[in-house]
């Protein structure tokens, strides 16, 4: 375990260091179209340095296509990087099968587990993971601390040069309070994981059921069951996601229309486009993330507020008005 400033640094270190250390074997990397930008932008950087990257597709639920991964593997493939669970739609990936594919062909397997670590079981030996990125703030540790797990037989060099901290692999004064915090948070997450999964899954399923049954022209994004226990992501037709967020915020409800890292962007989510949604529907997305501390009463409050907000926004939508007129004539 090597401590970092967070998930983005861990992803950058894992991918760039493998690229540098194994370039004699090859310069080909495989990842997916729905990765976090910490992975996608790192791969784009490496492409500018002469590396080749294959971006494999996903199905309608956001599950990576294993056959595409296997077809993409070449003699010069050095790394497969697939996230453990998607940060926007919550879909959990078949890591064990991907790990088996990678090792069958002698390829290193990295997973960005930032969204999953502390929320679902992740055993690096059982899943065949060689490199794993995590970030503390995703499981109640302080912000600004994360880690990169590196399997002992993986030879990668330093990402930050200078002193001999972290066994000479990451220079710089260690963030001791952050390290203590992430250690305590990891311990708590492991101790309470089974109970938290049960509580979050129950609330999540209740939220999804109410939204889909009570709000017309809504859809759930991501896998219906193989998803993070605290994730619910919806699309509502004829509505802009940003408008929903503003009105929810006025009710004291925190939500997002994509990933937190792209909340300032007006472009539709690359994840929703990758699962096949058209631009106009992807623009009406809403992500609600639950914790073990949420209550059924808070879910009820949120759903009631959301129903009123959607009615209000659709009344102002020319697209919805046109849709109703067209259906009147059918």
Which stretches of residues belong to each language-model region?
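Pyridoxal 5′-phosphate
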Residues: 1-330
């Amino acid at each position: 375990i090597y401590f970092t400033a967070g998930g983005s640094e861990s992803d950058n270190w894992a991918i760039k260091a493998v690229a540098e250390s194994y370039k004699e074997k090859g310069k080909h990397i495989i990842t997916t179209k729905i990765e976090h930008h910490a992975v996608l932008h790192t791969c784009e950087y490496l492409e500018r340095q002469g590396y080749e990257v294959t971006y494999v597709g996903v199905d309608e639920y956001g599950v990576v296509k294993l056959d595409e991964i296997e077809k993409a593997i070449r003699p010069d493939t050095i790394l497969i990087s697939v996230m453990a669970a998607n940060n926007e739609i919550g879909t959990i990936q078949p890591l064990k099968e991907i790990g088996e594919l990678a090792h069958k062909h002698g390829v290193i397997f990295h997973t960005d587990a930032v969204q999953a670590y502390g929320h679902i079981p992740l055993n690096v030996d059982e899943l065949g993971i060689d490199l794993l990125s995590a970030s503390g703030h995703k499981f109640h540790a302080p912000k600004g601390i994360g880690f990169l797990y590196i399997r002992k037989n993986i030879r990668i060099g330093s990402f930050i040069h200078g002193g001999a901290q972290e066994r000479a692999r990451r220079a710089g004064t260690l963030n001791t309070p952050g390290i203590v915090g992430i250690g305590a948070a990891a311990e708590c997450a492991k101790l309470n994981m089974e109970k938290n999964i049960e509580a979050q899954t129950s609330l999540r399923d209740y939220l999804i059921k109410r939204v889909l049954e009570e709000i017309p022209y809504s859809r759930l994004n991501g896998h219906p069951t193989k998803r993070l226990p605290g994730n619910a992501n919806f699309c509502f037709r004829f509505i802009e996601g940003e408008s929903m967020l503003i009105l929810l915020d006025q009710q004291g409800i925190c939500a997002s229309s994509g990933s937190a890292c792209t909340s300032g962007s007006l472009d539709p989510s690359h994840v929703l486009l990758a699962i096949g949604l058209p631009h106009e529907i992807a623009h009406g997305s809403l992500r609600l993330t639950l914790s073990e501390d949420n209550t059924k009463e808070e879910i009820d409050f949120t759903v009631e507020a959301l129903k009123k907000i959607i009615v209000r926004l659709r009344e102002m939508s020319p697209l919805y008005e046109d849709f109703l007129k067209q259906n009147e004539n059918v």
